[in-house]
């Protein structure tokens, strides 16, 4: 606990208003520096609507009482380090008090925080005590601003207390309450408040408590501060059995890495360490751990020195202030009082400047990211994270305990036991592995795994490390390795080479911290319902990632395509489609005797036996250096659990693969592949025959589905096999949580099977990879797409009040809604009714425009780049793209795409290869039951017809096609042509180019059968063939034929479909041209569109330009049409008709601002025509030579747009000072962004001259009032 393991610290302070962001930041800094367990603050001046403004990192539990007006207001802040459990809260509606009852470490505590009004304070407090009499007990503390002294010593004038105060003291005495400060300091003359009008000191802030609590009060003191005109009071309260609830594990502060001085100091330290300590007597493993210890100490020292330097002046002034106030309280003196006021003002200015810098840095970060698909937007919509604090747990007896010590013991013992069950039956492991055939890597592949680790591999891994992630136990972050890459990589290389030779890791590589993440929707009082995630040291992760990258190159040879989890190029929806195909096949079958089982594994990653894993790797042919390093990794790993912020005692990890290690998923898949191979090879476990293929399994890591015929025999043999596998591997299944679909025509047999199978029989649905698999495929829409619509409606309803513009809302749709929808489209591309898309579009548009009338037409927003890069997704086209992309898999004809060949239909599986860019089969029948592929085929043909494309004979028609096979060309000839020339007919050459394009083509002629050559020549030189094949392929054809990977496939098809189904829309830029009575060329329109995208890196700034160009703003003319009224005159009161160009430019009340802008341009020596198209649309004259100043002009113009929009429908004239303030805001934000992004030179080029002109136009009073000071010049 804060400060000690035996007491808590409580602070009380009147903050005198928190409506200023600077004041709130200063309060946060002060509270963090004091680090109390509980902080009571008064006079927040926040209203009921402003409660969200009071946020302090590390003090998430904040209880507030606020009124409707900006006065009074109290709050109690409880540190995250304090295990406080509230049981009752009472608030005053006017915000004068709040009472919170609760407990800390099972000791009861009641805190009443009071702000008494200036008049009648004693009577008010007395009334509060009367109202809350039943809640005040022997565990009560009352504190706050009482606005009255309680004793003679509480005033510097020694004036007697009045009658009301005497009555209050009497009431306190009757309820066994005492002034704790005065009791512990009976003769002290320290005060908390100075009254300037009366020139007197007084102690009107108090901590009052029950007499029973006095023995627990360790000490209390008054703390001078410069946040307000009050001093704070601090109380230390003893709590029995108080445990340290937070660990003090060191973690590198990444901000230090950005400090140039710190960076140079650390570079020198790293260089000196290795030069001094690298020798033959010290192993690289020990040297590396010693290096990290030295670095840790150096960072701590540098951070302490930096903080000391930063606070030296503040500490000096604070000491002076404390001494002067002490003297002033004893003997008042006017000159001393002036000195105190001066020091307070100086301290306030220093703190304000520091706070302002922090605020601007923070705002700059948001300035760059706000409304973009980035973290701020994600935070706005993310679900409230499950609380990681574990306050209750079921112990081994099944009883719920809240005792922190017992919770720690229960959790630690459970996970210690979980990871301690190491099997020693090595012979049984060998026997099991020898029973089944496993794939093996060849010598060349093994040598590839065992090649020496290189520096380039280490650099590539360091560059790819995700940033802003929690580090391992050593505290070093990914940013540390990236910042000192040049210095660290040479030694890391030597370290890894030493590990390769010796098979020994540094001790720190074995360490890990385990954090427990609650499984969603599970009972969190059960210790097994948490997911243990290992936080490993980054250096260990670098080594493991190198190993993972190497094995990943060969993983497809070792792992069957049934497994799609963590395998490159494989996707989860492959197995969903396969499962749907199997279910459809069973639905169609007349004789049903099948079962589909979704197997739930019990702590799968944590129970895998490490000896079995190592033996499996060896069985696959993996040996040598690669296996030696893996053996070393699993030699003696340890972990400590971080529970409620406290690090528990470490224990060994004898089983399992670490969740959080980059190598673990692949190692787990390799182990589970042994079981998968065994299931496939066991003939007594009969799968389901789909055409020529027997389908038994689908896996995504440990999520397994098994498809079986003859359930009684097959399921029993499956369970027996899994039981045998469990004995050697540690893998176990939870049969009660495993679910199954049972299909049988005979009710008696079905009942028998249900009685013998231990699985839960599902009657309607089974959830698999986020999709509801249904017992009958006809229910797929009902169980998946209808709930999806409901979920989206609920989400958008939850998000309706988020502080986000329409542009940000479009990005939320793209970031949070579109991926969900596409995943459903991918997994279940069935025919959807139009009502689904209508409802989906209606919901998203309602969210984007926040229940209001749309300002910009959907057709304009949906067109790419028409809205400055803010493109509204067209869900129907995404659906069409997802459905059609199956054709790419047909053309590729990959062996791994079993899901694509096994759909029940009248088409034979081998025919899919000949569907697109091939000769149509006359007798082809899809059949009425074709659920997915027929729908793809119909969409494919429809799009080809739309494009007027020949879908059958094209430049991408394959040599191994029906066109060539129907010529009775020998397979050997086809193979020879493919090996020597390519896979398409165009590669052979058509017309006069037939087999004469290259010397290799001519040489291939001699290798093929003469009769085949004659047939081929006849076909390839035919006029019809030449016309249809010898042409430039279209973009549509290239999408399906030229890309070897399906990465980005949907986006490519979608972008092409947007062009195909493009609709004519009103061009807003042409409307501007009409309003301005002029013509814009294509170049002008392109310039305006480009300007929307490039005018600023901040979307918050770009949004104004987008809104202006897209004609977003309502005008009197437009409103008159909407409301069907006759009043279309300018809202500013000039009397003219309020068209859009009038409101932005022509209005005589707006013109003075634009003339001021042009005066600034002349001061910048820029001669630009006084033309509205330039500031409003960014269309500069073609002969404008000062292109380098366009960035400067753009900032000025956009600031002017903001200023005009601010008074859009008000009878006010936009002022020059408002325009300058907006410019300065943009300037300040870009300044901090430029420093952070190392773009300061270009920033200076844009702003330097303009900064000088702005400062020259303002008086010193204006500069001070609006805090406008030079940032580039620094004066």
Swiss-Prot record:
Keywords in alphabetical order: DNA recombination, Endonuclease, Hydrolase, Magnesium, Metal-binding, Multifunctional enzyme, Nuclease, Nucleotidyltransferase, RNA-binding, RNA-directed DNA polymerase, Transferase
Protein name: LINE-1 retrotransposable element ORF2 protein
TM spans (from-to): none
Effect of mutating residue 703 to Y: Reduced transposition efficiency
Annotated ranges, domain Reverse transcriptase: 498-773
Binding, Mg(2+) 3: 556, 559-561
Region (Carboxy-terminal segment): 1096-1275
PROSITE patterns named in the record: RT_POL (PS50878)
Subunit relationships: Interacts with MOV10.
Entry GO MF terms: metal ion binding; RNA binding; RNA-directed DNA polymerase activity; type II site-specific deoxyribonuclease activity
Effect after changing residue 155 to A: Reduced DNA nicking activity and reduced transposition efficiency
Substitution effect: residue 202 to A: Reduced DNA nicking activity and reduced transposition efficiency
Outcome of mutating residue 226 to K: Increased endonuclease activity
FADD motif, short sequence motif: residues: 700-703
Effect listed in the UniProt record for changing residue 204 to Y: Reduced DNA nicking activity and reduced transposition efficiency
A Pfam family of this chain: Exo_endo_phos
Additional remark text: Long interspersed element-1/LINE-1/L1 retrotransposons are present in more than 500'000 full (6 kb) or truncated copies in the human genome. Most of them are inactive but one estimate is that 80 to 100 of those elements could be transcribed, translated and active in any individual. An active LINE-1 encodes for 2 proteins translated from a single RNA containing two non-overlapping ORFs, ORF1 and ORF2. ORF2p is described in this entry as a representative of all ORF2p potentially expressed by active elements. ORF1p is described in the related entry AC Q9UN81.
């Amino acid at each position: 606990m804060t400060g000690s393991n035996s007491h808590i610290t409580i602070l009380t302070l009147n903050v005198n208003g928190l409506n200023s962001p600077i004041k709130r930041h200063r309060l946060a800094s002060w509270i963090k520096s004091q680090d109390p367990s509980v902080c009571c603050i008064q006079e927040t001046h926040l209203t009921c609507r402003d409660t969200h403004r009071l946020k302090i990192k590390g003090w998430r539990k904040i209880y507030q009482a606020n009124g409707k007006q900006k006065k009074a207001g109290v709050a109690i802040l409880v540190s995250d380090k304090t295990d406080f459990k509230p049981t009752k809260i009472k608030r005053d509606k006017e915000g004068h008090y709040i009472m919170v009852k609760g407990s800390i470490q099972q000791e009861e505590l009641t805190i009443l925080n009071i702000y008494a009004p200036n008049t009648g304070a004693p009577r008010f407090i007395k009334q509060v005590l009367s109202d809350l009499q039943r809640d005040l007990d022997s565990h009560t503390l009352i504190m706050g601003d009482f606005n009255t002294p309680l004793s003679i010593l509480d005033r510097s004038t020694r004036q007697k207390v009045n009658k009301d105060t005497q009555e209050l003291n009497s009431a306190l005495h009757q309820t066994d309450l005492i002034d704790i400060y005065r009791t512990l300091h009976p003769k002290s003359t320290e005060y908390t408040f100075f009254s300037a009008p009366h020139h007197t000191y007084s102690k009107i802030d108090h901590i009052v408590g029950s007499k029973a609590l006095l023995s627990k009060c360790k000490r209390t003191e008054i703390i001078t501060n410069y946040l307000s005109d009050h001093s704070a009071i601090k109380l230390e309260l003893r709590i029995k059995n108080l445990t340290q609830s937070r660990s003090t594990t060191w973690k590198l502060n990444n901000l230090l890495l950005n400090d140039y001085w710190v960076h140079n100091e650390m570079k020198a330290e790293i260089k000196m360490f290795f030069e001094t300590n690298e020798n033959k007597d010290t192993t690289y493993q020990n040297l590396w751990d010693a290096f990290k210890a030295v670095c840790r100490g150096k960072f701590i020292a540098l951070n302490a020195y930096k903080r000391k330097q930063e606070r030296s002046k503040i500490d000096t002034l604070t000491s002076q202030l404390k001494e002067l106030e002490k003297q002033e309280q004893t003997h008042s003196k006017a000159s001393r009082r002036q000195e105190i006021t001066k020091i307070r003002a100086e301290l306030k200015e220093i703190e304000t400047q520091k706070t302002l810098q922090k605020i601007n840095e923070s705002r700059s970060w948001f300035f760059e990211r706000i409304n973009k698909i980035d973290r701020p937007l994600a935070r706005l919509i993310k679900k409230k994270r499950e609380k990681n604090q574990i306050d209750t747990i079921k112990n081994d007896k099944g009883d719920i305990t809240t005792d922190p010590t017992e919770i720690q013991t229960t959790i630690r013992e459970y996970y210690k036991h979980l990871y301690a069950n190491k099997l020693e039956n090595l012979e049984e492991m060998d026997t099991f592995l020898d029973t089944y055939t496993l794939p093996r890597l060849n010598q060349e592949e093994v040598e590839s795994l065992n090649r020496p680790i290189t520096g380039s591999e280490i650099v590539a891994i360091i560059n790819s490390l995700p940033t802003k992630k929690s580090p391992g136990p050593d505290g070093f972050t990914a940013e540390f390795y990236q910042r000192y890459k040049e210095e660290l990589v040479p030694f890391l290389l030597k370290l890894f080479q030493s590990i390769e030779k010796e098979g020994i890791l540094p001790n720190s590589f074995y360490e890990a911290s385990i954090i427990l993440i609650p499984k969603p929707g599970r009972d969190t009082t059960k210790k097994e319902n948490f997911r243990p995630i290992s936080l490993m040291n980054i250096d260990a992760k670098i080594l493991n990632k190198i190993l993972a990258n190497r094995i990943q190159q060969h993983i497809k040879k070792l792992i069957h395509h049934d497994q799609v989890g963590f395998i490159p190029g494989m996707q989860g929806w492959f197995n969903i489609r396969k499962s749907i195909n199997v279910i459809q096949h069973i639905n169609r079958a007349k004789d049903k005797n099948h079962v589909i089982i979704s197997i739930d594994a019990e702590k799968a990653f944590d129970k895998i036996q490490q000896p079995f894993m190592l033996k499996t790797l060896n069985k696959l042919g993996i040996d040598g250096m690669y296996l030696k390093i893996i053996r070393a990794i699993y030699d003696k790993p340890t972990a400590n659990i971080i529970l409620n912020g406290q690090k528990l005692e470490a224990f060994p990890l004898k089983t399992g693969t670490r969740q959080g290690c980059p190598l673990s998923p692949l190692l787990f898949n390799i182990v589970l592949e042994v079981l998968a191979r065994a299931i496939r090879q066991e003939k007594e476990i009969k799968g389901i025959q789909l055409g020529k293929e027997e389908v038994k399994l689908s896996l995504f890591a440990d999520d397994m589905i098994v498809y079986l015929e003859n359930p009684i025999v097959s399921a029993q043999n499956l369970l027996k096999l899994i039981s045998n596998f469990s004995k050697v591997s540690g893998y176990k299944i939870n049969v009660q949580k495993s679910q199954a679909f049972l299909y049988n025509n005979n009710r008696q047999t079905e009942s028998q099977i249900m009685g013998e199978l231990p699985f839960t029989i599902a009657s309607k649905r089974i959830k698999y990879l986020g999709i509801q698999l249904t017992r009958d495929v006809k229910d797929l829409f009902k169980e998946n797409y209808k709930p999806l619509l409901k979920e989206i409606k609920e989400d958008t309803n939850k998000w309706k009040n988020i502080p986000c513009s329409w542009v940000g809302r479009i990005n939320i749709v793209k970031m949070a809604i579109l991926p969900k929808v596409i995943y459903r489209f991918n997994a279940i591309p069935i025919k959807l009714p139009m009502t689904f898309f209508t409802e989906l579009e209606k919901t998203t548009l309602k969210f984007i425009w926040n229940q209001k009338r749309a300002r910009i037409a959907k057709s304009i927003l949906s067109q790419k780049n028409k809205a400055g890069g803010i493109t509204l997704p067209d869900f129907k086209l995404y659906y069409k793209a997802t459905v059609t992309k199956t054709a790419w898999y047909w053309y590729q004809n990959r062996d791994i795409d079993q899901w694509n060949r096994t759909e029940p239909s009248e088409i034979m599986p081998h025919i899919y290869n000949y569907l697109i860019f091939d000769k149509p089969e006359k007798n082809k029948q899809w059949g009425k039951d074709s659920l997915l592929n027929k729908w793809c085929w119909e969409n494919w043909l429809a799009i080809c017809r739309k494009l007027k494309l020949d879908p059958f004979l094209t430049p991408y028609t394959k040599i191994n096609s029906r066109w060539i096979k129907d010529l009775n060309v020998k397979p050997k000839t086809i193979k020879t042509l493919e090996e020597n020339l390519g896979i398409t007919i165009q590669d052979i050459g058509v017309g006069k180019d037939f087999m004469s394009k290259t010397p290799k083509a001519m040489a291939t002629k001699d290798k093929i059968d003469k009769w085949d050559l004659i047939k081929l020549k006849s076909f390839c030189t035919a006029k019809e063939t030449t016309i249809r094949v010898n042409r430039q392929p279209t973009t549509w054809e290239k999408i399906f034929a030229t890309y070897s990977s399906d990465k980005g496939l949907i986006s490519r098809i979608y972008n092409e479909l947007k062009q195909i189904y493009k609709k004519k829309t009103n061009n807003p830029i042409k409307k501007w041209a009409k309003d301005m009575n002029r013509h814009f060329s294509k170049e002008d329109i392109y310039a305006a569109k480009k300007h929307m995208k490039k005018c600023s890196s901040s979307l918050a700034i770009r949004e104004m330009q987008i809104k202006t160009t897209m004609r977003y703003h309502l005008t009197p003319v437009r409103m008159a049409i909407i409301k069907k009224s006759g009043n279309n005159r300018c809202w500013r009161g000039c009397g003219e008709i309020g068209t859009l160009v009038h409101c932005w430019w022509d209005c005589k009340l707006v013109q003075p601002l634009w003339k001021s802008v042009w005066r600034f341009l002349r001061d910048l020596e820029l001669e630009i025509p006084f033309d509205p198209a330039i500031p409003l649309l960014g269309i500069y004259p073609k002969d404008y030579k000062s292109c380098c100043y366009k960035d400067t002009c753009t900032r000025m113009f956009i600031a002017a747009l903001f200023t005009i929009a601010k008074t859009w429908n008000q009878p006010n004239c936009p002022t020059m000072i408002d325009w300058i303030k907006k410019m300065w805001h943009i300037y300040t934000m870009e300044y901090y962004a430029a420093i952070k992004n190392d773009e300061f030179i270009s920033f200076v080029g844009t702003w330097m001259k303009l900064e000088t002109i702005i400062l020259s136009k303002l008086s010193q009073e204006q500069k001070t009032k609006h805090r406008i000071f030079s940032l580039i010049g620094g004066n």
